[in-house]
Regions:
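Mg2+-dependent phosphoryl-transfer enzymes with acidic/Ser/Thr/Gly-rich catalytic loops
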Residues: 2-4, 11-20, 24, 37, ...
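Active-site metal-binding loops of divalent metal-dependent hydrolases
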Residues: 27, 60, 83, 253-255
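Conserved ATPase-coupling elements of RecA-like P-loop NTPase cores
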Residues: 32-36
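Active-site phosphate-binding/coordination module
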Residues: 38-152
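Alpha-helical scaffold elements within enzyme catalytic domains, especially in hydrolases
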Residues: 46, 110, 203-206, 277
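Residue-level signal for inorganic ion chemistry
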Residues: 47, 58, 82, 186, ...
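Short, structured coil segments at secondary-structure junctions
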Residues: 72-74, 82, 208, 264-265, ...
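Conserved acidic, metal-coordinating active-site core of Asp-based
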Residues: 117, 122-250
Length: 322
């Protein structure tokens, strides 16, 4: 059972109870320029020096997550693809929570019947795109958005994508042939009629019920995983491997796919840029990712200044580092 703390509770001098911190990447670890600031890196290092192991828990593909994991020198197993893959670098081993090829194939066929949906399949080593990478009008807009607000951010996002080997195929049948192993997840970008994605979700949920899990980290886009798989599931696997209980874990995130992880951890932290649905599940709300909220959280934690259900004031984007 998750421990909930009263508003008056402080962690003064008690940060040592926490042995692991699991960090989301997008909207949490990185800012809108897709940069991990020096302040954030320093705060993470100090947390590690204080005895808190640090890992990443992300919806990203393993290859994209790996570069960020190396950047902050994680010292616990890496959780990626929303908990569908856990990589332990200390033992060079992996744990998979894969979809069956049959279910993935049927989901892809169903999605392909909707106009202008973009479909991707994540396996451990690659990403498979059905149709042109830029076929979906919505997906084009999704890629253009970072360019509009931050050319540097767009460049860094594309650099992260470049780490992932990509196979482009024409249709679902070719995608099935291209899958050398069972898929970790199917990603579906909806079209400009958001009700179509809702209908698609209803259709596959009715058919597969508990055999699949559906989550989201991007507007009008869903990740379809094996039933029961989530970042929380991945975090439970990691905590068991490390011999930790839930009360010894910190989880920090900003989006819908972080909710279960935030609820699972002894100390669940929401970023200031998170929607209210996420903040309401957190024990603590820090500043937003463009105000170095993750760094601020660790600094306050180590200083014994964390008060549960405290919400830090949000500020405009920190221009000090790009």
């Amino acid at each position: 059972m998750k421990v909930k703390f009263k508003n008056s509770d402080l962690f003064k001098g008690n940060y040592k109870k926490f042995k692991l911190a699991a960090l989301d990447i997008d909207g949490t670890l990185i800012n809108s320029h897709h940069i991990i600031t020096s302040r954030t890196k320093n705060a993470i290092k100090k947390a590690k020096d204080a005895g808190i192991k640090v890992t990443i828990s992300t919806g990203r593909h393993y290859r994209s997550a790996l570069s960020r994991a190396k950047e902050i020198n994680i010292d616990a197993p890496l959780i990626c693809s929303d908990g569908a893959l856990i990589k332990d670098f200390s033992t060079n081993s992996a744990i998979y929570h894969s979809l069956s090829k049959e279910i993935a194939a049927d989901i892809m066929k169903t999605a392909s019947q909707y106009d202008d949906f973009k479909i991707q399949i994540f396996t451990e080593e690659r990403k498979i795109n059905i149709g042109s990478s830029y076929r979906s009008k919505y997906f084009k807009r999704f890629l253009r958005e970072p360019l509009k607000h931050s050319p540097i951010g767009y460049f860094n996002l594309m650099r992260d994508f470049a780490f992932i080997p990509v196979t482009n195929v024409k249709n679902v049948d070719e995608a099935i042939k291209a899958m050398e192993e069972e898929p970790l997840k199917v990603v579906v970008y909806g079209n400009e009629r958001q009700e179509d994605l809702k209908l698609f979700i209803e259709e596959i949920t009715k058919k597969y019920k508990d055999e699949i899990s559906i989550t989201s980290a991007i507007d009008n886009c869903i990740d379809i995983l094996r039933g029961g798989v989530s970042k929380a599931k991945g975090l439970a696997v990691v905590s068991e491997k490390l011999g930790l209980n839930r009360e010894e874990i910190i989880a920090v995130g900003d989006n819908i796919n972080d909710i279960k992880m935030i609820e699972y951890a002894g100390l669940g932290v929401a970023m200031g840029n998170a929607p209210e649905r996420v903040k309401s599940k957190a024990d603590y709300v820090t500043a937003d990712n463009d105000s170095e909220g993750l760094a601020i959280f660790f600094e306050k934690l180590l200083a014994g200044e964390i008060q549960i259900k405290e919400t830090l004031p949000q500020t405009k984007f920190c221009q000090s580092e790009r």
